[in-house]
Amino acid sequence: MLIPLLALAALALVPTGASAQNPWLERRVLNIAHQGGESEFPSNTLYAFKRSVRAGADMLELDVGVTRDGEVVVMHDTTVSRTTNGRGTVASHTLKRLRKLDAAYWFAPGRADPYRHGLKRAAYRLRGVATGKRRPPRGFTRADFRVPTLRTVLRAFPRTPITIEIKARTRQEETAEYVRNATVLAKALRDVRRRDIIVASFRQQAVDRFHELVPQIALAPGIGGAASWLLAGGSPGAGVAAFQLPITYESGGQRIPVTTAENVVRAHREGFAWHTWLSDDGESVATWRQLIDQCVDGVMTSRPVAFERTLRAHSAPAACG
């Protein structure tokens, strides 16, 4: 099985004009801390980002929403109730109100579902740090456990690559909401000179809108662009530097393979990097090793500390380049 896989990977080493200009193809395999590593640390907090980078993460993945007063903040869900002690949507809160919330309130480390509500109080070991009811771990502050602004994260990690996913504003997740948030994000990043940022969204319209306003920042395609490339051999869209896709997509009750050796080879040949996220497929050492052997350029993992151990023990095949 590995021999044909390596043969396919060797084809990806043929240089093209596009690949020569894509810095995201220059390093493999990136340990990308999804939400900062939400299975090991409280989702999308400065504490999570700092811990994952110290453990060896090469890149941070985070999600952004927009507050009622127009501030870009880092939060995975459109609502705050799953991870914090608050209620309502991100869009219904002002930044001042959002900053009072405890972003580690429902984090119970060491569990299959680390954000399960209703456990014994002792399970939520970091609850109260943000509000001053518990002393922060050594080397950290109360602010590391609150909802951060995107500006704060960029300032805290000036040399760590970051991928930013645009979220919606309500539970209905209308396309217009994504486009609006893309517009606000573009304004926030318009004068940023960094070239180690990738912007993504499930909605292609949001990605396209962001590119219209800030064409110098790299993109990952939405579902529309990815489907065009995967199913019809078309373009994934302007400004795309990397695919950020799962191992499989579920459609009609069936799992359709997406991250395959053939697709990774094709992406590399056409000058695109390939980052795989694992939320719907589960994470294991066996899965991580499979992805490394397929020559993916990055793995978006909820367990960056554990994944780093696998990376150190299992290198990408020489044919990956």
What is each residue range found by the language model?
Residues G17-G321:
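Phosphate-group recognition and catalysis centered on beta-loop-alpha active-site segments
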Residues M1-A20:
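Secretory targeting and sorting signals
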